[in-house]
């Protein structure tokens, strides 16, 4: 069973989503199915079929979340440190050509959100940065060609 690395924040978010699905969404869809059933003939009951489809989606997501939480390897980023880039690090990098700076936090796959500056540990940028230190350069393969980045700052918070 492969472990899934995630921050405490990411773990809490998955638990919160699971709680909502089990305590709010599941009972709501069961009530909707019951209501649709009361309308008679199920073979031509679009409301019933839509509710059953939604139930299938919700049950699938619950199963997926249960599995991810069971395999979670929760990493407390506040207890990490050092100068090397690892999971949980907040890294400031600069494009070697343009000198544009960007800051990313390296997180688990389910937590990744580029708009919030969070990238997956399995992303090309994160894979290129892992193990680097401040001042090191990392080359990232991109669709438009390879880009070189310099590690400016590594922080664990």
Swiss-Prot record:
Presence of the UniProt keyword Transcription in the record: yes
Cross-referenced SUPFAM superfamilies: FKBP-like (SSF54534), GreA transcript cleavage protein, N-terminal domain (SSF46557)
InterPro entries given in the database record: GreA/GreB_C_sf (IPR036953), TF_GreA/GreB_CS (IPR018151), Tscrpt_elong_fac_GreA (IPR006359), Tscrpt_elong_fac_GreA/B (IPR028624), Tscrpt_elong_fac_GreA/B_C (IPR001437), Tscrpt_elong_fac_GreA/B_fam (IPR023459), Tscrpt_elong_fac_GreA/B_N (IPR022691), Tscrpt_elong_fac_GreA/B_N_sf (IPR036805)
Keyword Lipid metabolism included in the entry's annotation: no
A molecular function GO annotation: RNA polymerase binding
Keywords on record: DNA-binding, Transcription, Transcription regulation
Origin superkingdom: Bacteria
Pfam families membership: GreA_GreB, GreA_GreB_N
Function: Necessary for efficient RNA polymerase transcription elongation past template-encoded arresting sites. The arresting sites in DNA have the property of trapping a certain fraction of elongating RNA polymerases that pass through, resulting in locked ternary complexes. Cleavage of the nascent transcript by cleavage factors such as GreA or GreB allows the resumption of elongation from the new 3'terminus. GreA releases sequences of 2 to 3 nucleotides.
Family: Belongs to the GreA/GreB family.
Designated name of the protein: Transcription elongation factor GreA
Taxonomic lineage: Bacteria, Pseudomonadati, Pseudomonadota, Alphaproteobacteria, Hyphomonadales
Gene designation: greA
């Amino acid at each position: 069973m492969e472990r899934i690395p995630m921050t405490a924040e990411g773990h809490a978010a998955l638990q919160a989503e699971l709680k909502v699905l089990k305590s709010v969404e599941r009972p709501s869809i069961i009530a909707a199915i019951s209501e649709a059933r009361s309308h008679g003939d199920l073979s031509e009951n679009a409301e019933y079929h839509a509710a059953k489809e939604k139930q299938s989606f919700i049950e699938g997501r619950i199963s997926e979340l249960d599995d991810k939480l069971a395999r979670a390897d929760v990493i407390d980023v506040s207890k990490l440190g050092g100068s090397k880039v690892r999971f949980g690090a907040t890294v400031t990098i600069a494009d070697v050509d343009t000198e544009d700076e960007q800051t990313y936090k390296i997180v688990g796959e389910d937590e990744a959100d580029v708009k919030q500056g969070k990238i997956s540990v399995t992303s090309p940028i994160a894979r290129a940065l892992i193990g680097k230190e401040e001042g090191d350069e990392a080359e990232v393969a991109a669709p438009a060609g390879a880009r070189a980045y310099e590690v400016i700052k590594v922080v664990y918070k």
